């Protein structure tokens, strides 16, 4: 996505690594998929006032991960301009919740999954 828009990429990390030095922004993020809470970290060197941020994630279920990242963006003084996800689980509340907060685009929205047959119903 960043390559298409010709903008920099900033990764939010679940653990402090040696390439994240100095002051950081941090927030707690609940992962529906993994059933646990993570501390998400972004170096203050890469995010701050005047930045415009588009959040990108692979899956959207209950919206807690993107909600936590949006809080981190707000805490930094940057502006959240929208969010994009690859797959949204439309049968869970995350998409509706986030659309009340910011512009959200999903490449695919799964409206139903049949556990017995494995059939997936996509939103049109």
Go through the PLM ranges and name each one.
Residues 1-5, 69-70:
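Short Gly/Thr/Asp-enriched flexible loops that form oxyanion-binding sites at enzyme active sites
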Residues 6-7, 78:
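Short glycine/serine/threonine/alanine-rich loop segments
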Residues 7-53, 119-122:
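Short, glycine/charge-rich flexible loops or terminal/linker lids adjacent to PRPP-binding catalytic cores
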Residues 59-60:
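Conserved Walker B
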Residues 63, 67:
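Glycine-rich SAM-binding Motif I of class I
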Residues 68-124:
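PRPP-dependent phosphoribosyltransferase catalytic core
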């Amino acid at each position: 996505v960043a390559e298409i828009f010709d903008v920099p990429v900033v990764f939010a990390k679940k653990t402090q690594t040696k390439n994240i030095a100095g002051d950081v922004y941090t927030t707690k993020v609940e992962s529906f998929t993994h059933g646990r809470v993570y501390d998400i970290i972004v170096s203050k060197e890469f995010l701050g006032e005047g930045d415009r941020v588009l959040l990108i994630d692979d899956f959207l279920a209950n919206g807690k991960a993107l909600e936590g990242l949006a809080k981190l963006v707000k805490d930094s003084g940057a502006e959240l301009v929208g969010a994009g996800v690859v797959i949204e689980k439309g049968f869970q509340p995350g998409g509706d919740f986030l659309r009340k907060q910011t512009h959200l685009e999903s490449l695919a929205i799964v409206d139903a999954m049949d556990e017995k047959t494995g059939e997936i119903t996509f939103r049109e």
